[in-house]
From Swiss-Prot:
Its EC number is 1.5.1.5, 3.5.4.9. Pathway: One-carbon metabolism; tetrahydrofolate interconversion. Catalyzes the oxidation of 5,10-methylenetetrahydrofolate to 5,10-methenyltetrahydrofolate and then the hydrolysis of 5,10-methenyltetrahydrofolate to 10-formyltetrahydrofolate. Belongs to the tetrahydrofolate dehydrogenase/cyclohydrolase family. It catalyses: (6R)-5,10-methylene-5,6,7,8-tetrahydrofolate + NADP(+) = (6R)-5,10-methenyltetrahydrofolate + NADPH; (6R)-5,10-methenyltetrahydrofolate + H2O = (6R)-10-formyltetrahydrofolate + H(+). PROSITE patterns: THF_DHG_CYH_2. Keywords: Amino-acid biosynthesis, Histidine biosynthesis, Hydrolase, Methionine biosynthesis, Multifunctional enzyme, NADP, One-carbon metabolism, Oxidoreductase, Purine biosynthesis. It comes from Levilactobacillus brevis (strain ATCC 367 / BCRC 12310 / CIP 105137 / JCM 1170 / LMG 11437 / NCIMB 947 / NCTC 947) (Lactobacillus brevis). Pfam families: THF_DHG_CYH, THF_DHG_CYH_C. This is Bifunctional protein FolD. InterPro entries: Aminoacid_DH-like_N_sf, NAD(P)-bd_dom_sf, THF_DH/CycHdrlase, THF_DH/CycHdrlase_cat_dom, THF_DH/CycHdrlase_CS, THF_DH/CycHdrlase_NAD-bd_dom. GO terms for cellular component: cytosol. One of its GO terms (biological process) is tetrahydrofolate interconversion. GO terms for molecular function: methenyltetrahydrofolate cyclohydrolase activity; methylenetetrahydrofolate dehydrogenase (NADP+) activity.
């Protein structure tokens, strides 16, 4: 029987753990702080930021949302990031993407203190992940959330085959690194991959993050596989759906994430978890 991986419940459990950690910090007069910088008025960004802000406050995390006009210059945005870098009440800094045209997003991310890089996108932290270095450092939230989900399954990853469809810096590439670090044999597919189905059918764990509605059909998966759908798409009727044809794929596999209610809740829960991580690590360094 197929296991439907309940991202909402796993996120709820993770949030409860995070709230407990926040309460313990507050007993020592330490409050984790998250700063989210939004430039322009992208409607989707506004929804994401509002959800992050509400969740942070609910868990007891200090949440600062800095809204800036689309006319903000590179220098002005960099200056604001640098101010949060030295603010002892802020432990995590997030610059909401996409940024308006004319702003260099990579340069802005690189300006964030790597020890406050709550999204795990700073080149130093990306390099640490890909080098599988020991130590405490933030990583990309969605892939980390997926690893948390996989840990709830009665499956050993070591030695198994994983295929990641998508090579973005936000999901695909860090996801492949985390699975490789878990001793899986990993392949990464993308828009130029030939004979995609031949590759995806080899996967014991298939992670799909393309933004292409129902790209993966029942014939594209290995029977008994675990399928993680990162897609958040709209079908022709406006219904929220994913990159995987859930109704037809689910009966063939051992476990699958639904859309909605799968990966989505885990991303914000992991962001909150990582904000508290950064606060605790800062305390251990004697910065609080």
């Amino acid at each position: 029987m197929t296991t439907i991986i309940d991202g909402k419940q796993i996120a709820k459990d993770l949030n409860a753990q995070t709230a407990t950690r926040v309460a313990a910090l507050k007993k020592r007069d330490i409050v984790p702080g998250l700063a989210v910088i939004v430039v322009g008025d992208d409607p989707a960004s506004a929804i994401y930021v509002r959800n992050k802000h509400k969740k942070a406050l609910k868990l007891g995390i200090k949440s600062v949302v800095r809204e800036l006009p689309a006319t903000t210059t590179q220098a002005e945005l960099t200056q604001i990031v640098m101010a949060y870098n030295v603010d002892p009440t802020i432990h995590g800094i997030l610059v909401q993407s996409p940024l308006p045209a004319g702003l260099d997003e990579q340069a802005i991310v690189a300006a964030i203190d790597p020890q406050k890089d709550v999204d795990g996108f700073h080149p130093l932290n990306v390099g640490r992940l890909f080098a599988n270095l020991p130590g405490k450092y933030p990583v990309s939230c969605t892939p980390r959330g997926i690893m948390t989900m996989l840990a709830t399954l009665p499956m050993h990853l070591r030695g198994k085959r994983a295929v990641v469809v998508g090579r973005s810096l936000i999901v695909g590439r860090p996801m492949a690194a985390m699975l490789l670090n878990a001793d899986m044999t990993v392949s990464v597919a993308h828009v130029h991959t030939q004979h995609l189905s031949d590759l995806t059918r080899t996967a014991d764990v298939l992670v799909v993050a393309t933004g292409v509605t129902h790209l993966i059909k029942a014939t594209d998966v290995k029977p008994g596989a675990v399928v993680i759908d990162v897609g958040m798409d709209r079908d022709e009727n406006g219904k929220l759906t994913g990159d995987v044809d859930f109704d037809n794929v689910a009966p063939r596999v051992a476990a699958i994430t639904p859309v909605p209610g799968g990966v989505g809740p885990m991303t914000i829960a992991t962001l909150m978890q990582q904000t508290v991580d950064l606060c605790e690590w800062s305390e251990q360094r004697g910065n609080n």
